A protein has these predicted regions:
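Small beta-barrel nucleic-acid-binding modules, primarily SNase/OB-fold domains
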Residues: 1-117
Length: 117
C-alpha cells in the first residue's frame, strides 16, 4: 500500500514535540486548506515529565518527526481535545510508524492501560 494514496490519511508537518506521545502539527486538508492540531499517538503511552525515560521518549519522537513531513491517520479525539492518531514518517526512504517504533524501542510507560498491541 502506498501511504500517500490512502484515504483518510493526511499529510502534515510536525511543528512541535510536546512529549513522546503528543505532537503539534499543521495538517494539509486539501484545497489549499490547513489546520493546526495537537495529536496524541493512539495505543501508546510514554513517560510524563519527571518519570523515568521521559527525556529518551521525547527525544526519540523529536528525532523522528520534528520539522518533518509526516502522514497522519486520525481517529476520534480524546478528553483533552487532542485527536488520536497513527503517525508515519520517512526514515532512509522507508515509511515507518512512530507508534510502532516507540514500542519497539522500549520507550513506553510500563504497565499503562493505554499501551495496546
Amino acid at each position: 500500500m502506498d501511504i500517500k494514496d490512502s484515504l483518510y490519511i493526511f499529510q502534515g508537518v510536525c511543528t512541535n514535540v510536546v512529549d513522546g506521545d503528543t505532537i503539534d502539527v499543521i495538517l494539509d486538508l486539501g484545497f489549499k486548506t490547513s489546520a493546526e492540531r495537537r495529536l496524541r499517538l493512539i495505543n501508546v503511552d510514554t513517560p510524563e515529565r519527571g518519570q523515568d525515560n521521559f527525556r529518551e521518549a521525547t527525544n526519540f519522537t523529536k528525532l523522528c518527526v520534528e520539522g518533518q513531513k509526516i502522514y497522519i491517520q486520525t481517529y476520534k479525539d480524546d478528553v483533552f481535545g487532542r485527536y488520536l492518531a497513527k503517525v508515519y514518517y520517512n526514515s532512509d526512504n522507508e515509511v515507518r510508524c512512530l507508534n510502532d517504533d516507540l514500542k519497539t524501542e522500549g520507550l513506553l510507560k510500563p504497565y499503562s492501560k493505554w499501551n495496546k498491541k
